[in-house]
């Protein structure tokens, strides 16, 4: 929103929210009526292209979003090295509004101008006219309109909304108040109306021109330099006809320079080109290699989780993951396709996120596999190979710590990472499974006045540590798993072993659990508090019970470039396993935390609090 919003700031369908696509219902109804009356042959090319062209534009923009986020996380060609936060993602989530607006206006034009219904697929002379009119009137008028928008009166009421994003993403290009988009559409309609008037309009000419506008808009705001220098060396005048991402980035950081639409020609003429444009272009193209201090290794969970990655769909990634959202079901075909492609071609981990905490740099890498694949016996070796390759890559780059998230540290897969430590005893990178901090978070979430807890956690080292700590605290730990009970009993000091009890009666209302099925949840007494020790949340089956979060903490304000949620966790909340790796790097701890090794629980907790991480709940 602009600093002082003026008239026509909001889109007409703003209050419809996610149901805004209903505004295209007249177009769908029109097409359906014609098909039912006269068959598919009654649809001319002009009408047939309206809806498909809108869909293609959305796909085009999404490709740019994913590409930009991937490149800015890993590439040395990043232009503005600052973070993006959730407020920017929320502000820019309506990037498809202008596509719907264009669709409605094109439909209105189709109804108002019968001559366009007979236009051919392609006219070369029409394409030439479009190019000439854009280069002349459109670029000229846009330049001066843009300069007018930077006058205080219009800037504070309209254009400041766009400039709220100093670090740009491709979709920043279309984040403007509705009134601005009306003017932009009029400008971009000039070449199209010119070809209609001259009689050389064509379907592909219109679609191609809109695609050109989208491409240049997205490229100019992608925040990484990709235009090769050899293009300008072969044809030097091109620097006046095509801007670069670094050229337009200066407009967002300096505000009073580089006003041109796509062609810097007018900035050269009117002396508004930023003097550092060439220098920034060259430095961005050259780039600077950087090595993260920490790499957190994650993976996709279910099929739809690919959209929840930071490089997926921005608005979905900015919210805690939920597979119950109705619109997610429409993406199932693409989800299946992405899974198959990842399974076949996913030969290494890929970068999905880049985070900074003061001077420390962190990256998140994803193994291109899904939850169900980790449970397949024949997939264990290939998955371990992928994890091993990621560890060795991190080691070769000089990364200090690599933390294993989700199932990448599964005991049945690699013994909580012990497999890699044994295989490569001279590793420079420290392998961290985060068990010490995860244990601390669980223990700190248990009320201090608790006298009894029910433990249903299996035999993991986190479960052992929790049982030992609770018995040492004088808390009665009740279990109903005989084999697990005897295993834990042997590891608890004799003077505290009496606090561990095998019983199925008088189960308390405080349950510490790993993975329990529906039947076990139904057995819990009313008012039970479930505290999970797993990285995966429990299914919330009971409305009369309380479900605590998986072990996690709130991150400090100093942590930047956080604009996506970690799986199902709320905004600016991070799993204990991820935080453990950060602490390992910050503190310079030299030990591996994998296999049976575990960081001291109190030491991990104290370090987390000292560095600004906060508990989600107070015991």
UniProtKB/Swiss-Prot annotation:
Keywords: Endoplasmic reticulum, Lyase, Membrane, NADP, Transmembrane, Transmembrane helix
Principal location: endoplasmic reticulum
Record-linked InterPro entries: CER1-like_C, Fatty_acid_hydroxylase, Sterol_Desaturase_Related
Stretches that traverse the bilayer: 45-65, 94-114, 126-146, 178-198, 325-345
Residues in Fatty acid hydroxylase domain copies: 138-272
GO biological process, one term: lipid biosynthetic process
Pfam families reported for this sequence: CER1-like_C, FA_hydroxylase
Annotated Gene Ontology cellular component terms: endoplasmic reticulum membrane
Compartment(s): Endoplasmic reticulum membrane
Topological relation to the membrane, as annotated: Multi-pass membrane protein
Listed GO MF terms: aldehyde oxygenase (deformylating) activity; iron ion binding; oxidoreductase activity
Catalytic activity: a long-chain fatty aldehyde + 2 NADPH + O2 + H(+) = a long-chain alkane + formate + 2 NADP(+) + H2O
Listed EC numbers: 4.1.99.5
Highest taxon in the source lineage: Eukaryota
Function according to Swiss-Prot or TrEMBL: Aldehyde decarbonylase involved in the conversion of aldehydes to alkanes. Core component of a very-long-chain alkane synthesis complex.
Subunit composition and interactions: Homodimer.
Family classification: Belongs to the sterol desaturase family.
Name by which UniProt lists this protein: Very-long-chain aldehyde decarbonylase GL1-4
Phylogenetic classification of the source organism: Eukaryota, Viridiplantae, Streptophyta, Embryophyta, Tracheophyta
